[in-house]
Amino acid sequence: MDFPSRFEVIVIGGGHAGTEAALASARMGAKTLLLTHNVETLGAMSCNPAIGGIGKSHLVKEIDALGGAMAMATDKGGIQFRVLNSRKGPAVRATRAQADRILYKAAVREILENQPNLWIFQQAADDLIVEQDQVRGVVTQMGLRFFAESVVLTTGTFLGGLIHIGMQNYSGGRAGDPPSIALAQRLRELPLRVGRLKTGTPPRIDGRSVDFSVMTEQPGDTPIPVMSFLGSKEQHPPQVSCWITHTNARTHEIIASNLDRSPMYSGVIEGIGPRYCPSIEDKIHRFADKESHQVFIEPEGLTTHELYPNGISTSLPFDVQLQIVQSIRGMENAHIVRPGYAIEYDYFDPRDLKYSLETKVIGGLFFAGQINGTTGYEEAGAQGLLAGANAALRAQGKDSWCPRRDEAYIGVLVDDLITLGTQEPYRMFTSRAEYRLILREDNADLRLTEKGRELGLVDDVRWAAFCKKREGIAQEEQRLKSTWVRPGTEQGDAIAQKFGTPLTHEYNLLNLLSRPEIDYAGLVEVTGQGAEDPQVAEQVEIKTKYAGYIDRQQDEIARLRASEDTKLPVDIDYSGISGLSKEIQSKLGATRPETLGQASRIPGVTPAAISLLMIHLKKRGAGRQLEQSA
């Protein structure tokens, strides 16, 4: 039967990509349906109980700046917060939170259920309704038909999911959940390039069977950081420590002697696993010279004894898993609550997507998350928000939007995926961005919230808080610029004594703050006045100290902007462009870049080829002008 009500956007999947997609679409006023096979697993953390980290927290903060849920749910569910790289520059500092799975999931569900324009329905999606290369809706497992202008697929590891533990395998989307077989078969019928990837998870341990006294304690930071720009430490539940132990020679011997029983090394698993989150057997094989590897013992929540041993993801047989765990210091008597496993699943080549994350071959069909070859909650959430927003824009007859590489890590992520594709699960790092000093986690709101407001993603509460912060920064910069200190005065002498820097002439406080040896907190201590909001103080200090570097990056961005924004015609025939080699014609034809800037980032496309493209575009433009004037 047909569902009696029509929607503008349908989102399939209730994981990190799906929830952000559905929320984004609904915030923009589109009537949105979130289809999930199980309402109880909305926002579930399928793998590690943590949000953020190097490169990843930048995505979380950008999701937050655009009104998303991930950071707010983390503040409500985070049981340990730390700032990584705190001794390094602001470009690479990253907030990481250990989360209580139950609290995090509950926070996500609360946000979903209180979002206007959003309906939730529990049914697996088995088929897409496609007419004349346009998606029209979805057919569920029981034959119920839903219709909409846009459909967002966020299927995670469920498409053709196959779980491996040793030589045994069985179909599953994740442990305890069925796979999506019918939808996977339907998608394989579409003219899209498909492949297989693999990810894995470690065995879970009962904390009552672990000896923490021989491990190294890793407490959270004090003062406790927050993840959301609207967050506060008062939202946080009680905080706990993580613990560190190590594998050893005995552990490595057990693994090495059982590699023939590993589905990875016996050819059973075809999918490629994540390079930057390898299984323990992969680590032992690839880094045979290392005597030990760190294992982070992470609590799964405040109301459970379950522990997540981060660093020993494995698909070895259970008897080997038990030997591995019990060979590690502090876990000699450990009880495994859930075995580790690997899961293999379908993904689709992201080069078949537009910047909006809409497929090039089926209008109105959007992909987000692991279906695009990424790994990680944060990468999924970022894509989900973008796909959901663009699905709503399409349904409303408006132009799509995607931030550029110099505007957001979301822009870096999408550009990498649709330009380069990926043959292994893609993870975000700060090193992937050319303009790291501009794309910091601390200024994500200053970069994106105004655009989010324009799109309809940002509500009144967030907008008011943002405007207050932005105004506070401007006022504090002006105060520092207009406050002067002279040598020989009480303040001048106090500054010289505090920082060991005698004043040679009159300075304003903004000039002084630009010196490497002078910090904002110290200036406030000496002068007795400063910003009350720590976010304002942080922005003023970073902007002042790194002004020269930031200006240089902005100049470089401005120079490149022209080619970045030059659109390539959808119908361009690369085989007809004189001077392009067959190889470059093939690469351009396979990727179908949307802009000249994107074309320049395709491996093997030379600067000379870009020049030829520019000449072709000029000739094409001149030719069309002549046709119009004739």
Swiss-Prot record:
UniProt subcellular location: Cytoplasm
Binding site for FAD: 13-18
GO molecular function list: flavin adenine dinucleotide binding
Cofactors required: FAD
Keyword check for tRNA processing: yes
Entries under Pfam families matching the protein: GIDA, GIDA_C_1st, SAM_GIDA_C
A cellular-component GO term for this protein: cytosol
Keywords, in A-Z order: Cytoplasm, FAD, Flavoprotein, NAD, tRNA processing
Signal sequence, start to end: none
PANTHER family named in the record: GLUCOSE INHIBITED DIVISION PROTEIN A, PROTEIN MTO1 HOMOLOG, MITOCHONDRIAL
Record-stated family: Belongs to the MnmG family.
Protein name: tRNA uridine 5-carboxymethylaminomethyl modification enzyme MnmG
Organism of origin: Pseudomonas fluorescens (strain ATCC BAA-477 / NRRL B-23932 / Pf-5)
UniProt lineage: Bacteria, Pseudomonadati, Pseudomonadota, Gammaproteobacteria, Pseudomonadales
Gene: mnmG
